[in-house]
């Protein structure tokens, strides 16, 4: 069947008001970049005529501004899931301009197949190649591409020539059977291949192919500073101690790491520490630091869902495919983030906390308990099942006016039962095997900024008798003071003891 080449505007004509639309990619990597803008223009035109036009959006995770940003600014979104990081979309969601369902990334594809989230009308996917018999080669990110292509009534492909056809072979596309027929996912090392090198679809569903020549949108991280470097060193030193104590095997285990400055610092410090052997990565996002360590021989293999790297690095990878092709594997997020595989491989999972309380609970998503930041992403997928789950965070934010550690988290994403270790620039709190009071003292002693230690020690002393000594009269005093004066330093416990 011959492929039909169309414009982005023609592609947008296949997307209707109230459609549920699935998009490929994971972070800006692998996301469609021109059709979403055409849909946004269509929405604006319909709104100017007095007609409704909004769609339900299903993505792999966050996307680029050309997708989430364009559609948010056009008020073209009625529903969005999962993780997001675009400022305009965030504002829309927090103002209730669109409904947002935050969910674990590993669960999205199967939830779609189960019918929990409705049908998929249209799949819009980016490809490095597509054949007339329906073989789609993804680009630098996979996300939920296989599932949305199989479920959608109509498929629109952005054929992006920035990604060479020779990338074929860097993907491992596998969808597990649904219950009651599901079997184990047969991944026993990060480099195991279990699926296909492309996504196979009914070519009759491909309503059009839009040719593009678009780079990935990449946000720049701010330079590493003393705080992030100290966190990185503390993580590396802690892992070396675990190896020497025999709690981690001397061969080490695969690593999962989040994205951002702290993650880059952690990876860099691990790479520099020769007491940590060369290691494998089994993660969701493969970023610049992983590629740098791979070139140095410190990372042996990286399995992920996306190459969320700078355009300079992606050009380097494509120019040296002979070197990288047998060292990188991109999978659907249902596999890259699967808790079954995480537990089998025995990952060290390192993720970032937005806020923690002194008893070891983690808030990854909500500022002051109400305002959505980004979402839980894949942190829950990995944390619960990891051999060793670590959360990192700077001890303070906003020039010290906000403590990352509070009496009680204002929103709970990861409970004390899943969080094994917390690390800041001041040190390491190893919470394994500790009671709530022991955890609190360990966190205050090792992780809390010195300015906030007295306040949190006083709070612990005010705790109501019981296994976990919270004081419900004043457990949110830090948040109340932040709202009142803009500075958590100003907490006055005497206000609560009248």
What are these regions (language model features)?
Residues 1-498:
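Conserved alpha/beta enzyme-core scaffold
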């Amino acid at each position: 069947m011959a492929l039909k080449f169309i414009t982005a505007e023609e592609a947008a004509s296949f997307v209707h008001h109230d459609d549920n639309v699935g998009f490929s990619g994971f972070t800006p990597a692998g996301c469609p970049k021109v059709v979403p803008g055409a849909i946004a223009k269509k929405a604006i035109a319909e709104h100017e005529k007095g007609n409704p036009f909004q769609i339900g959006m299903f993505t792999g995770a966050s996307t680029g501004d050309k997708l989430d940003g364009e559609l948010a600014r056009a008020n073209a979104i009625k529903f969005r899931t999962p993780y997001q990081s675009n400022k305009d979309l965030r504002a829309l969601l927090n103002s209730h301009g669109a409904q947002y369902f935050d969910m674990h990334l590993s669960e999205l594809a199967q939830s779609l197949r189960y019918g929990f989230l409705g049908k998929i009308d249209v799949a819009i996917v980016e490809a490095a190649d597509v054949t007339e018999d329906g073989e789609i080669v993804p680009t630098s990110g996979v996300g939920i591409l296989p599932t949305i292509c199989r479920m959608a009534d109509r498929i629109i492909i952005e054929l992006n020539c920035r990604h060479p056809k020779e990338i074929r072979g860097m993907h491992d596309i596998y969808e597990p059977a649904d219950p009651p027929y599901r079997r184990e996912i047969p991944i026993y090392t990060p480099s195991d291949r279990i699926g296909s090198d492309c996504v196979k679809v009914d070519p009759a569903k491909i309503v059009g192919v839009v040719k593009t020549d678009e780079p990935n949108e990449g946000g720049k991280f701010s330079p590493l500073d003393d705080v992030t470097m100290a966190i990185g060193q503390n993580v590396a030193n802690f892992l070396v101690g675990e190896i020497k104590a025999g709690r981690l095997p001397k061969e080490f285990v695969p690593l999962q790491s989040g994205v951002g400055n702290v993650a880059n610092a952690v990876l860099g410090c691990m790479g520099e520490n020769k007491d940590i052997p060369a290691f494998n990565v089994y993660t969701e996002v493969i970023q610049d630091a992983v590629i740098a360590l791979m070139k140095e021989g410190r990372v042996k293999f990286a399995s992920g869902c996306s190459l969320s790297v700078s355009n300079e690095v992606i050009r380097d990878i494509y120019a040296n495919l002979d070197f990288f092709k047998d060292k990188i594997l991109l999978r659907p997020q249902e596999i890259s983030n699967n808790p079954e595989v995480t537990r089998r491989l025995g990952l060290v999972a390192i993720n970032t906390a937005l806020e923690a309380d002194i008893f070891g609970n983690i808030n990854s998503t909500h500022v002051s308990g109400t305002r959505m930041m980004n979402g839980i992403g894949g942190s829950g997928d990995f944390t619960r099942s990891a051999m060793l789950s670590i959360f990192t965070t700077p001890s303070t934010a906003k020039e010290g006016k906000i403590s990352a550690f509070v009496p009680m988290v204002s929103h709970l994403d990861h409970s004390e039962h899943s969080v094994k270790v917390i690390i800041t620039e001041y040190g390491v709190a190893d919470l394994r095997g500790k009671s709530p009071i022991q955890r609190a003292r360990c966190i205050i002693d090792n992780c809390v900024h010195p300015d906030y230690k007295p306040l949190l020690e006083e709070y612990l002393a005010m705790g109501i008798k019981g296994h976990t000594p919270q004081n419900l009269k004043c457990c949110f005093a830090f948040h109340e003071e932040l709202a009142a004066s803009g500075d958590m330093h100003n907490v006055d416990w005497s206000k609560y003891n009248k």
